[in-house]
Amino acid sequence: MGIDMSEEKEVKEIKVEIPKEIADKIEKITSFLNSLKDKKEMVSKEKIEEMLKLIDEVKDKLPKLNVDIEKLAKILEGSGSEVKIVFNKLTIDGEVGLKIIPLKKEKKE
């Protein structure tokens, strides 16, 4: 999956503020996951359980984002758009792509 840099696209970001406590936990989880990439040795069951507990805590405390797809489709009506959602520091390489190509609504007479 490559990125085509020949085409300039308008990029918009949505930033979400989270408490420092949660950011610290995310950083700890990320560091642990990154350390696993290079390790060839065993990881203790306790360490895995600790990380799973932190992940559950973080997951429950992150703000819920509601996206109104119908409203988004109305704004983009008749045009194609690509939405890219990137999760920084939540997974080793967390990235989700979503292409939205809304259909034009036909007016009923």
UniProtKB/Swiss-Prot annotation:
Top-level taxon of origin: Archaea
Family per record: To A.fulgidus AF1885.
Full protein name: Uncharacterized protein MJ1539
Record lineage: Archaea, Methanobacteriati, Methanobacteriota, Methanomada group, Methanococci
